[in-house]
Swiss-Prot record:
HAMAP family: dUTPase_bact (MF_00116). It comes from Burkholderia mallei (strain ATCC 23344). The gene is dut. It catalyses: dUTP + H2O = dUMP + diphosphate + H(+). Substrate binds at residues 67-69, 80, 84-86, 94. Belongs to the dUTPase family. This enzyme is involved in nucleotide metabolism: it produces dUMP, the immediate precursor of thymidine nucleotides and it decreases the intracellular concentration of dUTP so that uracil cannot be incorporated into DNA. Its EC number is 3.6.1.23. Its cofactor is Mg(2+). This is Deoxyuridine 5'-triphosphate nucleotidohydrolase. It comes from the Bacteria. SUPFAM superfamilies: dUTPase-like. Keywords: Hydrolase, Magnesium, Metal-binding, Nucleotide metabolism. The keyword Cell membrane does not apply.
Length: 148
């Protein structure tokens, strides 16, 4: 798939999103910062990437996801848990960053902060019904299938 990428900050030419390995599903996104940003425990920040994308095809969307190492080792996760980029969005990719850890974290300029994953999208059309055809599960939820 081809993806239109617009560089909004010239410094990002040296830090284009890329897959870390041939098996990577996510493209690394970096913090486009002039200076380090310190996040105290509980702090949030909206971090620019200096990049914009345009998927154009309504059959695709992009997800901004946290990097597992930052979350596990430092408590740095996405403030909105997952960022959804619609196919028609053309603005700058911003990363809602939250320090849910117990210590301060310094985010450095151009540090890898999140990952971008392209996913297929199916847009549903609703069919209004009075009731559903019976299924094995029915309306059971919240532990109805058992534990373990």
């Amino acid at each position: 798939m081809k993806l239109d990428l617009k560089i909004l900050d010239a410094r990002m030419r040296d830090y284009l999103p890329k897959y870390a390995t041939t098996g990577s599903a996510g493209l690394d996104l970096r913090a486009c910062l002039d200076a380090p940003v310190t996040l105290k425990p509980g702090d949030t920040a909206l971090v620019p990437t200096g990049l914009a994308i345009h998927l154009a095809d309504p059959g695709y969307a992009a997800l901004i996801l946290p990097r597992s190492g930052l979350g596990h080792k430092h408590g740095i996760v996405l403030g909105n848990l997952v960022g959804l980029i619609d196919s028609d969005y053309q603005g700058e990719l911003m990363i809602s960053t939250w320090n849910r850890g117990q210590t301060e974290f310094a985010l450095n300029p151009f540090e890898r902060l999140a990952q971008l994953v392209i996913v297929p999208v199916v847009q549903a059309r609703f069919n209004l019904v009075d009731d559903f055809a019976q299924s094995e599960r029915g309306a059971g939820g919240f532990g109805s299938t058992g534990r373990g």
